[in-house]
Regions:
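Short C-terminal tail/terminal secondary-structure segment
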Residues: 220-234
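Conserved mid-core segment of classical short-chain dehydrogenase/reductases
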Residues: 82-96, 138-141, 179-183
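Alpha-helical segment proximal to the catalytic Tyr-Lys
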Residues: 115, 158-159, 217
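Conserved glycine-rich cofactor-binding loop
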Residues: 16-17
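Short, small/polar-rich loop/turn modules that mediate ligand/substrate recognition or access, typified
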Residues: 161, 166, 219-221
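Catalytic Tyr-X3-Lys loop
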Residues: 81, 88-108, 122, 126, ...
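A conserved structural motif in NAD(P)-dependent oxidoreductases
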Residues: 193-204, 215
Length: 234
């Protein structure tokens, strides 16, 4: 643990629970100053943690907050929601909600924060994607939003690579978070990967921490899977 005053500033969405909380907690232990964005009350306490209440599904709110975060050295977009449904019974409103939280929020935040990183010639962006981006029955709308994050990350990575800014996606398989027990996904339960257990949020946090480090300066535009061997089954 770094006992010195944190120098780097990370913005983490979805920081009150699940993967986002694990990432924020890991970064705090590593000596970062963290701003956590979430619509629910913060669950972390640290002198180096600042909670910002925000509904990432409301674009105007995200835009207003993003303008206050241009000093961020890293952005981790971990906020997410899952709604399931097969073709013929798709819920348009559920699809729109997932698009706003996953894709629109990422676009709004990056539209403000990424240019500032490029101007400083230093920065890291990580989106939390999903292996489901490759497609899965009953989760087409969710998959589309996560696939969009991969397309955005590769496009933006190409735009800012020469300014020493990296943009990557970390795509977990089923993870041990509250989302696994969400009643909204009861029609499509999580499947255990070959390792026989769910991915732990702390495992994802450590991978994200590496991508934010100087050692990962040459990794950009990548979709990195942490799947417990699930990809071996295809």
């Amino acid at each position: 643990m770094n006992d010195d005053a944190p120098q780097k500033h990370a913005v983490v969405t979805g920081a009150s629970a699940g993967i986002g909380r694990a990432i924020a907690e890991f970064l705090l232990r590593a000596g970062w100053r963290v701003t956590g964005m979430d619509r629910t009350a913060p669950t972390l306490e640290s002198e180096h943690f600042r909670a910002v209440t925000a509904d990432l599904g409301i674009g105007a709110d995200v835009e207003s907050i993003a303008a206050q975060l241009v000093d961020a050295d890293a952005l981790v977009h971990a906020a997410g929601v899952l709604r399931v449904g097969r073709i013929g019974v798709l819920d348009r409103h559920a699809g729109e909600l997932m698009w706003r939280i996953h894709v629109d929020a990422a676009s709004i935040l990056c539209n403000t924060i990424l240019p500032a990183m490029a101007d400083r010639r230093d920065g890291r962006v990580v989106f939390i994607g999903s292996r489901i981006a490759q497609g899965m029955p009953g989760r087409g709308q969710y998959a589309a939003t996560k696939a969009a994050l991969i397309a955005l990350s590769r496009s933006w990575a190409a735009e800012v690579a020469a300014q020493d800014v990296t943009v990557n996606v970390v795509s977990p398989a089923a993870t041990a978070t509250g989302m696994v027990n969400d009643p909204a996904r009861s029609a499509s339960s999580a499947q255990l990967p070959p390792i026989g257990r769910l991915i732990e949020p702390a495992e994802i946090a450590q991978l994200v921490g590496y991508l934010l480090s100087p050692a990962a300066a040459a990794i950009t535009g990548q979709d990195i899977s942490i799947c417990g061997g699930a990809s071996l089954q295809r």
